[in-house]
Amino acid sequence: MSDKILVFGHQKPDTDAIGSSYGFSYLSNHRPNGALNTEVVALGTPNEETQFVLDYFGVKAPRVVKSAKEEGVDTVILTDHNEFQQSISDIEDLTIYGVVDHHRVANFNTAAPLFMTVEPVGSASSIVYRKFLEANVEIPKEVAGLLLSGLISDTLLLKSPTTHVTDHKVAKELAEIAGVNLEEYGLAMLKAGTNLSTKTAEELIDIDAKTFELNGSNVRIAQVNTVDIPEVLERLSDIKAAINASMTANGYDDFVFMITDIVNSNSEIIALGAHPEKSEAAFNFTLADDHAFLAGAVSRKKQVVPQLTESFNK
């Protein structure tokens, strides 16, 4: 096996998954003491928002891999995730050298000690930025741009309840290094990810989707950002058909789909599967035609997953 270490974010990568992995790979390769031989890769192609970021800063998208072993590699670093079902296909057969994440730790174990940093901040990119400072490694403009974009994406330009008090300082400093106006660039970037008109229903429910094991149930939780929830709901029947087909094909017990209005900071929730009552209890609403409005909800990590976890555990 090669001595190379692959660095990647989760399946169906978002901007933070790609930004944090790109940044951490660069840092790992340029540490003054103990540099590693890493390559940033991805577990999927960039979405429209992420492609906007890559084009803006002139960065080539990481190549997509399906299996580390097929690459002749047996050691990996994970960013923006830790749960095995969200990772590379052969994760259980690999050595995990390190993890940089800002999510819950679950369905994760290793046979050997590792470097692991998990913090309740707005993005994995925020953590990577601080690691640059700790290592005293200069951040190139394009790397700063990718890290900034990961933070903007995950916190909806610092408006999400997942935003940590330290993220504001991180965003300001990264914007200065990247040479962008935080507000202007952030809005343009977020809007680039809201063009859903060209997406099929099958693509919509798969743009940003993660699988969670909740008390023995396999629950898929997906999210799309928009500036017009009613426009998306015009396609409700097609979306529900796509969700049902996905559950059948992939063995999901339940599927929760968040349609998030990034302007007004609300979401519409579509919930299908074996336990719709768990969603109703989690969010204290009543589903009508399998969907309901959830005021103030923009974060899957903080406003959906914990509530569903508690509901499924009852």
UniProtKB/Swiss-Prot annotation:
One of its GO terms (cellular component) is cytoplasm. Its cofactor is Mn(2+). Pfam families: DHH, DHHA2. PANTHER family: BIFUNCTIONAL OLIGORIBONUCLEASE AND PAP PHOSPHATASE NRNA. Belongs to the PPase class C family. This is Probable manganese-dependent inorganic pyrophosphatase. Mn(2+) 2 binds at residues 16, 80, 102, 154. Keywords: Cytoplasm, Hydrolase, Manganese, Metal-binding. It comes from the Bacteria. The lineage of its organism: Bacteria, Bacillati, Bacillota, Bacilli, Lactobacillales.
